[in-house]
Amino acid sequence: MVDTKNPGDKTLSVGPSKTLTLKPRVEQGTVRQSFSHGRTKQVVVEKRGKRRIGGDAPAAEPVAASEPTVARAPRIPVRPAPPAASRANSGVVLRTLTEDERTARASALAEAKIRAEEERRIAEAEAARRNSKEGIEQAEREAAEARRKAEEERHRQEEEAKRKAELEAKRRFGESETKAAPAKTTTTTTRAAPPARPAAVAADGSDEEEAPRLVRRPGGGPARPVVAPKPAAKPAPAKQRGRLTLVTALSADDVRERSIASFRRRTQRLKGHASNEPKEKLIREVIVPEAITIQELANRMAERAVDVIRMLMKQGAMHKITDVIDADTAQLIAEELGHTVKRVAASDVEEGLFDADDDSTVVEPRSPVVTVMGHVDHGKTSLLDAVRHANVVSGEAGGITQHIGAYQVTSPDGKKITFIDTPGHAAFTAMRARGAKVTDIVVLVVAADDGVMPQTVEAINHAKAAKVPMIIAINKIDKPDAKPERVRTELLQHEVQVESMGGQVIDVEVSAKNKTNLDKLLEMISLQADLLDLKTNASRPAEGTVIEAKLDRGRGPVATVLVQRGTLRVGDIIVAGAEMGRVRALISDQGETVDEAGPSVPVEVLGFNGPPEAGDRLAVVENEARARQVTSYRAHQKRENAAASSSGMRGSLEQMMSQLKTAGRKDFPLVIKADVQGSLEAILGSLEKLGTEEVAARILHAGVGGISESDVTLAEGFNAAIIGFSVRANKEAAAAAKRNGIEIRYYNIIYDLVDDVKKAMSGLLAPTLRETMLGNAEILEVFNISKVGKVAGCRVTDGNVERGANVRLIRENVVVHEGKLSTLKRFKDEVKEVQSGQECGMAFESYHDMRVGDVIECYRVETIQRSL
């Protein structure tokens, strides 16, 4: 291949050499713009020429908007390559290309082909994009038209709302004339659809867009096409850009109006003026419990807590929002703020638990409940054993009843009668009171040979307080010294008049030993029950009273319950005092397991979480949630009462601190465990009565059940004794007590327990010191002996003087020394005693200030042990 080499030939050229200049493309003008209300404004309008790249092209002819033109794929003109032949008239000698030049030219040609193929693919893709762009623009035009219509509708609605708001503002604030411009009727201007891009045809028949120009590569390689820049995004309207054009400035349709944001701000201001008007205060019903925090009270009233605190400060009380105030103060604050108050109490959880009215159409007769009361050893339990054909007395320790018991018997006429046996000992006053409260009839047993005794009088008072009828059973008429008439006469002193003496109280002479007149006694009880007309609803939830409670090692907490209303069934959820549970088993007085217990039936109930207190009322509730509410309230009340009593004790101790220090009161610490709640209650009452100002029993812990290791640990900490009443200690507790030296005492009879504790407490009492006068002696002369010291020469004037006795040295009727007589001599001999009228020598222990004329008084001190 040959080529010409012409020094003047420039193969790499973009075009003819031209000078680069910047021509002004901006034309300016001034336009006067008019606004509403006669306002005008001078506006500078600039007109910019269109910048063209790649030379001047002929102007494009616009195409009608109704006839959109579909863009055609641009044609890429191919410029013919320059001929490789040498110029004929160049006159230059040709030479052969070197191997490197041929290789470079071959590489350049290959690269040019690759670039040409890439440019062809790019051009085809650009043509396809332009074809799809027309369809997209059509869809955009339709969407713009829909948006325009929606915007016009929104403008119309906002104008209407603005007009109504202005009218409302004028009416509310009484404006004389409107400040806002009258509502302008929005005219719907039909805007022409934006015209399609005109398809300008070039002079040579090519499309509007200029074909990519080819740029030659250095070295004579194939030309590389220059890709035209992509069209910029569609500019926003001039109004949105915030500047005016000549066309928009001269147009009358684009008069500036209030913006939407301005209208919204005005609406907000109007709403703010309306919100500043005084609001009508809402009166609320405020529920006020017994205690409430200030924050909670403010929340319930929908008031600020600061306002509540301010009102409290006016009353002279400084509080925080977390402080608790009482119900009275909360009610005063709520009423002062204009609210109504509804007082509630925590005890409202117990409403409807007891004493619900029964339907008179479903009531049916029930068995009477009879309580046997009287003095100790008058034969109450023996009489009940004779009626039941049982032998309960033999099972009682000491032959006295120390537990309250409930039994059910059948009378000769087939009716059932429930008996409650109460102890007669003075310590069981609370048991007798409980028996009188749950009973329908009281049988007062009086021994014919003993008459009316203190516990008999107490039983009469219990029956009168409970307002229940009495039947007098004069027992032990089989004894030779029985005097029933004396019993009737003594009862008159306590306002009990029997039928035989013109009264209304039934009396029956019986003998429990010989079973005399027992049928007559049961007949009188049935007659009295018929007069009372006892009826109840057996189908309602059960209510009853806990007669006795204990902690059984094998069965857990066990409560003896007398069902008074309704029917108690296995599985019922029950509440008694601060304890709750589900009935696991019901055991009758005969020891049989039953499924239910009706009215007036005594049963043992198993299933409590803990042993309830004797005397607590039992009720069946609907679910465990209600049971937990009731028991938690009662437990809280119990803790508060205990805290109040302890704080009261602390206050009294602080007030009497000086007296306690001088008196030196001593405590006798005890840990007491009993078998049942009633016995424990009786023991605590008896020990409390033993206390004096000098010594008292301090009960560290009292409970029901056996003695455990924790009881021993507690007793060890306070060096206390442990008392077990009808209970025993387990192996661990016994071993711990033996190891730590803790004394455990067991008792079965209550008065033995009380007597032993009384003796032990008496040992803590300070003994009484009693002085016995022996005689007087007068000092005649004082001698000073080197080994002994001063010795007084005395004459005994009265009684006698003994060596080692207590003496007082009296000078001018004032006691100057008290001590002991260390030396007593007659002449030179030590003697034990000197009689009246004799002279002797005396010396005191550690005292030598003796003078002539002093009187020595000699006496003996005796120590006498005291007892409670």
From Swiss-Prot:
Residue intervals passing through the bilayer: none
Pfam family, one: EF-G_D2
GO CC annotation: cytosol
The keyword Protein biosynthesis is assigned to this record: yes
Region: G1, residue numbers: 374-381
Protein family per UniProt: Belongs to the TRAFAC class translation factor GTPase superfamily. Classic translation factor GTPase family. IF-2 subfamily.
Listed name of the protein: Translation initiation factor IF-2
Name of the coding gene: infB
